[in-house]
């Protein structure tokens, strides 16, 4: 499989206070396309980063409406994946993908 197709399944890493705390438990959080599923994500992450994935949890964030300057604006939803790595392994997100 071509490297470009592998990277299509991972949009970006999510770096927040909560995800930073999860990284201490060998968990990494990525924003993924809505069409992504657990089996494809596991294969792609293991090929790209050369780590062993033990578990994947997927959270689907729905579209929501927000008011901006008196007008209703739709904010597009997204899907995020929480990936649990084998103990002792990690992914360095600061080096760039």
Swiss-Prot record:
Subunit structure: Part of the 50S ribosomal subunit. Contacts protein L29, and trigger factor when it is bound to the ribosome.
Protein name in UniProt: Large ribosomal subunit protein uL23
GO terms, biological process: translation
InterPro entries reported in the protein's UniProt record: Nucleotide-bd_a/b_plait_sf, Ribosomal_uL23-like, Ribosomal_uL23/eL15/eS24_sf, Ribosomal_uL23_CS
Organism annotation: Pelagibacter ubique (strain HTCC1062)
Function of the molecule: One of the early assembly proteins it binds 23S rRNA. One of the proteins that surrounds the polypeptide exit tunnel on the outside of the ribosome. Forms the main docking site for trigger factor binding to the ribosome.
Family: Belongs to the universal ribosomal protein uL23 family.
GO cellular component: ribonucleoprotein complex; ribosome
Keyword GTP-binding among record annotations: no
SUPFAM superfamilies from the UniProt entry: Ribosomal proteins S24e, L23 and L15e
Domain of life: Bacteria
Keywords: Ribonucleoprotein, Ribosomal protein, RNA-binding, rRNA-binding
Pfam family, one: Ribosomal_L23
Record GO terms (molecular function): rRNA binding; structural constituent of ribosome
């Amino acid at each position: 499989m071509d490297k470009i197709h592998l990277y299509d399944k991972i949009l970006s890493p999510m770096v927040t206070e909560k995800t930073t705390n999860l990284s201490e438990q060998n968990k990494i959080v990525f924003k993924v396309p809505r069409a992504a599923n657990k089996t494809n994500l596991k294969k792609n992450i293991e090929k790209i980063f050369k780590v062993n994935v033990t578990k994947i949890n997927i959270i689907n964030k729905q579209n929501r409406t927000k008011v901006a300057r008196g007008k209703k604006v739709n904010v597009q939803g997204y899907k995020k994946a929480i990936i649990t790595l084998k103990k002792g392994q990690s992914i360095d997100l600061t080096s760039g993908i």
